[in-house]
Amino acid sequence: METEMKILIGLSGGVDSAVAAYLLKKQGYEVTGTTMSIWDNFLPAPKTKVNDSCLGPENENIETAHKIADFLTIPLYVTDCSGEYKKVVLENFRNEYKEGRTPNPCIRCNAYIKFGILPAAVKKTGLSFDKFATGHYANIGFDSSTNMYKLYKAADLNKDQTYFLYRLTQKTLSETIFPLGIYTKEQVRNIAKKIGLPSAEKPDSQDFYCGDYNDILQFPANPGNIVDKNGRVLGKHNGIWNYTIGKRKGLGLLGGTKDPLYVINISAKQNMVTIGTKEDLYSSSLTAKKVSWCSILPPKKTIEATAKIRRQHKPEKAFIIPQEDSSVKVEFAQPQMSVTAGQSIVFYKDDTVLGGGVII
């Protein structure tokens, strides 16, 4: 083993990245930490605990990261990525909601900020390192038969984070280490407690932002109609960005209805929200664009795989059909509920992440 290899690890102040840093140091690597700063008080502070989300006041997290670095006796650099984060992640977040889509900012952040701008910014300071590591639950391997790096699911399938990592490139995979991929969350917690890490009891973050999304969107009211499938007006909305596919509560309907109703379509062009029954939420196919193949070359013909249309979605059998414009059509073996434009669909073959794209 190359004990002199230099590893830069992203330290969030949480237990996962702290244990990852500990494991790397224990294996003999020269470890340096970096903490990404993305908060510059451009929004009112969310009224919740700091560690409930990624985006929010981060003084406590940075302080904890320093304590972790001191505990592990490794250097720590705080890297300001707030400008890039606003431009790359938050502007896209606002634009997508304005168009009636529901984005996943964590996927975009991973692809462009955490695994791109963050390590690149540290390199610009003159610090040299061989690999970049994080506390994500995922695995990376090299397939000599295809001469390609592969992204694999984590051992702990309940904590597996590959859904958020499908946009990592071959170059990024070749430069990345995921020390926690072979561990369960319980094992990670136990390691943290056993060695007395400062973040051992810290709860997991729950979302990218724990306040009202309108804090970020800041759109003026734009009233429009809520209609049924036949175009009959059932109510009014103040902005399509307040709705997502599958939403049931707080729809703003004028009167009671016999059956539960759900949002089944959002049209930015018509400034209209369409509602229907639960049965109307099911789709047997979808189209995805901005497709990224992380572990294989772009397929030229139909492939069979399993697909997830959201983080908590159980992978379902599907056929991925490449299109001439580099998008893909996905046909499911069984209809799927709440296919949502703006969310990502991720393709798997057993434990291998093939790639994914953005649902349109």
From Swiss-Prot:
The record marks H136, Q343 as: Interaction with tRNA. The active site is at C109, C210. InterPro entries: MnmA-like, MnmA-like_C, MnmA-like_central, MnmA-like_central_sf, Rossmann-like_a/b/a_fold. Disulfide bonds join C109-C210. It is found in: Cytoplasm. It is an enzyme of class 2 (transferase). Keywords: ATP-binding, Cytoplasm, Disulfide bond, Nucleotide-binding, RNA-binding, Transferase, tRNA processing, tRNA-binding. ATP binds at G10, L11, S12, G13, G14, V15, D16, S17, M36, G135. Pfam families: tRNA_Me_trans (PF03054), tRNA_Me_trans_C (PF20258), tRNA_Me_trans_M (PF20259). It catalyses: S-sulfanyl-L-cysteinyl-[protein] + uridine(34) in tRNA + AH2 + ATP = 2-thiouridine(34) in tRNA + L-cysteinyl-[protein] + A + AMP + diphosphate + H(+). The keyword RNA-binding applies. One of its GO terms (cellular component) is cytoplasm. Its EC number is 2.8.1.13. GO terms for molecular function: ATP binding; tRNA binding; tRNA-uridine 2-sulfurtransferase activity. GO terms for biological process: tRNA wobble position uridine thiolation. It comes from the Bacteria. Belongs to the MnmA/TRMU family. Catalyzes the 2-thiolation of uridine at the wobble position (U34) of tRNA, leading to the formation of s(2)U34. This is tRNA-specific 2-thiouridylase MnmA. The lineage of its organism: Bacteria, Pseudomonadati, Elusimicrobiota, Endomicrobiia, Endomicrobiales.
